[in-house]
Amino acid sequence: YPEPTEGSIGASGAKTSWPEVVGMSAEKAKEIILRDKPNAQIEVIPVDAMVPLNFNPNRVFVLVHKATTVAZVSRVG
């Protein structure tokens, strides 16, 4: 499906993706995500790593290049 441009909003009205953090440092991305979703369990992982397949509505994956720069849209999951 197409990439969101302003972040997706889930059925509960909560934000579920953060396209605005692509290109930022992982630390800055975490700060922004936690502002929108204070209970988020943020996992910073390399873009080519395997991610768990079980869905967790409180988990947000931040996929990074070279362990510092956000590479893809961060999403709940």
Swiss-Prot record:
Highest taxon listed in the record's lineage: Eukaryota
Protein name in UniProt: Subtilisin-chymotrypsin inhibitor CI-1C
Any one GO BP annotation for this protein: response to wounding
InterPro entries xref list: Prot_inh_pot1 (IPR000864), Prot_inh_pot1_sf (IPR036354)
Site for Reactive bond for chymotrypsin and subtilisin, residues: 53-54
Disulphides: none
Keyword Metal-binding applies: no
Site (Reactive bond for subtilisin): 24-25
Role: Inhibits both subtilisin and chymotrypsin.
Recorded GO MF terms: serine-type endopeptidase inhibitor activity
Biological source species: Hordeum vulgare (Barley)
Keywords tagged on the record: Protease inhibitor, Serine protease inhibitor
Family the entry assigns: Belongs to the protease inhibitor I13 (potato type I serine protease inhibitor) family.
